[in-house]
């Protein structure tokens, strides 16, 4: 048995080859070539082989279309097999597809609608609306495959992106145009945290957000959409702040492997054409890798470590390198990271970690204390927490906060066994301040106001630094712990303390 010879190329090389084969309009625009027709020759799950006439072979990464009774099925060219045959990845189910069906070459990669018309809408991997609210009347479409911005276009300055969330801005600040890993199990407030970030970015920076559900549960996507409508992040009658792109768990691997690029393309438009600071959420980046692994095996590539695709680092790099800051605007990415069997050395999370600028860890232990957002102040890290980037005062305050919380953590066993009375006076003071800091790191969210009844607070970075500095200096040692819980800045603490005192009298 003679196996066909595979010409597996990296996506970057394929894109360059496609550019040689297909005339381009502009830097990232494609001019559609004359449509050529082919026939389905084999269907192997999510992989479809298509044969064309001599001299009409479509370029790698081109989109092909098949008209089916259910609608249009889009295929993406992955390999040239020889004998005028291409191997393609299906973006939808291939059930009912038979040999001999007609296939047309679009002459360009998959393109999706971009612009403000996408805000408040839910779209799939090929840019079709799936929210039953009619077509998206976008004036422009962009291909999902693109090169990262050139070095001369990129901004090299390390700049903090203010989120208005105290614990993040103080202890694990986000880089403008950076990549943040969001670690959190079920029920620790990940969705609310994401919604608040979307809300705050819109308020503080006037920017938009793109939420990309990669291989997530359909129920979770539905819940997120409903919650966003309830909290006003999505406004069906007026301006919305977010576009939703979903490729759920039940989708074929081709859709799950490409849906992250669809979301990124929409975000890139807001950055490059409108000069916006865009927030891109990817939930879950592991599913992107997992889908690539499924597709790779079907394409006949020899698996590497733990069964992952041999192109794992390349695939991840092509996605992550497009998430960056340019001189026009930025795309800041928050990526939920699933760690298989809690093994951080697994190739999928290990490859992701190489690209991250900051990690935000949501802790079940902290959420059980009723402290929200349940961000672990000792486990969450950022490369921006450096005196040269954030300034000496910010760095000193953040370091002292972490040292105080760490000292409290190490004293907890002694307190549990012997009680507070056995501690030295200095340790007692440390514990009291640490407990106040712990509560002060909580914050009422605007998107949770409908549930808690507490108005949300967006706290500026300079106010956060000065507030925590005052607590560390002992200026508010006389105030009760409860006054520090679920408030914004230090003026809110004083007001709450006065209110508590008045109620007590």
Curated annotation (Swiss-Prot):
CDD domains: ATP-synt_F1_beta_C, ATP-synt_F1_beta_N, F1-ATPase_beta_CD. One of its GO terms (cellular component) is proton-transporting ATP synthase complex. Keywords: ATP synthesis, ATP-binding, CF(1), Hydrogen ion transport, Ion transport, Membrane, Mitochondrion, Mitochondrion inner membrane, Nucleotide-binding, Transit peptide, Translocase, Transport. Its EC number is 7.1.2.2. It is found in: Mitochondrion; Mitochondrion inner membrane. Its main location: mitochondrion. It catalyses: ATP + H2O + 4 H(+)(in) = ADP + phosphate + 5 H(+)(out). GO terms for biological process: proton motive force-driven mitochondrial ATP synthesis. It is an enzyme of class 7 (translocase). SUPFAM superfamilies: C-terminal domain of alpha and beta subunits of F1 ATP synthase, N-terminal domain of alpha and beta subunits of F1 ATP synthase, P-loop containing nucleoside triphosphate hydrolases. The keyword Hydrolase does not apply. ATP binds at residues 184-191. GO terms for molecular function: ATP binding; ATP hydrolysis activity; proton-transporting ATP synthase activity, rotational mechanism. Belongs to the ATPase alpha/beta chains family. Mitochondrial membrane ATP synthase (F(1)F(0) ATP synthase or Complex V) produces ATP from ADP in the presence of a proton gradient across the membrane which is generated by electron transport complexes of the respiratory chain. F-type ATPases consist of two structural domains, F(1) - containing the extramembraneous catalytic core, and F(0) - containing the membrane proton channel, linked together by a central stalk and a peripheral stalk. During catalysis, ATP synthesis in the catalytic domain of F(1) is coupled via a rotary mechanism of the central stalk subunits to proton translocation. F-type ATPases have 2 components, CF(1) - the catalytic core - and CF(0) - the membrane proton channel. CF(1) has five subunits: alpha(3), beta(3), gamma(1), delta(1), epsilon(1). CF(0) has three main subunits: a, b and c. This is ATP synthase subunit beta, mitochondrial.
